[in-house]
Amino acid sequence: MAEVINGILINEAETKNIMTKSSLPVGGYSVNPYVGCTHACKYCYASFMKRFTGHKEEWGTFLDVKHWPEIKNPKKYAGQRVVIGSVTDGYNPQEEQFGNTRKLLEQLIGSDADILICTKSDLVVRDIDLLKKLGRVTVSWSINTLDENFKNDMDSASSIERRISAMKQVYEAGIRTVCFVSPVFPGITDFEAIFEQVKDQCDLFWLENLNLRGGFKKTIMDYIAGKYPDLGPLYDEIYNKHNRSYFEALEVKAAEMAKKYDCPFVDNEMLYGRVPQGHPVIVDYFYHEEIRGTENTGKRNR
């Protein structure tokens, strides 16, 4: 029975299997405890899901709470990459009420899977007890600005301050963490400033360029024209004329930053492991849609 809670249309959805074979290059499984995402990010690539789910509502205004049969044999996924939150955020605000992600984590205990949780929330701190039991687990927070006003223009998720605080708590609990600088907005995102804030509390520092396609391209281009008119020509050059020189220059800057802070610089870091504090692995995912398989090509600064 559909109901509206705090302005969000909530439905329930039955699914035969919560574990979906992934089409991503890294393989494994994608697991999404919800359909939709109420963070309502203006640049969200996952909004394409409406084509398959039949939702007519605006992206960010609905959420389907999935129900699935209990995972009876978690060891089936031993050694597999399991990505939680590829087209939703398992820690959207409604998770506090429905608890789907916590239930999922409980069912995966003993799986020995390589679990990656992608989020923009600090609610994940609630589940540190389970994360410790899971073993090989990584938690990634998307942070592409330190400017809360810009963040608020782009999404309704947890503040940047709360995300960074959550990252610190999870890191100090002995769990591998990622700062995912995504998407990098040309002329707006200062990834070195972000790095300086988080370098002592993350194992990996991922960089990904802003991709504009589909319906949200116009949304972002109009936003830039209205809020950052001086950047209009740059965005036109990158997103209409497909000039790559800006992000190519950022790759050079990222490599220089890696040398400055004595950090590895790679272009596809997926293996599980921890690193010395203050020296996270910097991962270049610019134009990742053209990458690169599952193996690291070995592009390093040392």
Question: What does each model-identified segment do?
Answer:
Residues 1-138, 146-150, 160-161, 172:
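Conserved Radical SAM active-site core
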Residues 29, 82, 115, 139-141, ...:
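Hydrophobic faces of well-ordered beta-strands that scaffold small-molecule active sites
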Residues 102-105, 128, 163-167, 191-195, ...:
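Generic structural signal for well-ordered alpha-helices
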Residues 109, 132, 165-174, 255-259:
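Surface-exposed amphipathic alpha-helices with a cationic face
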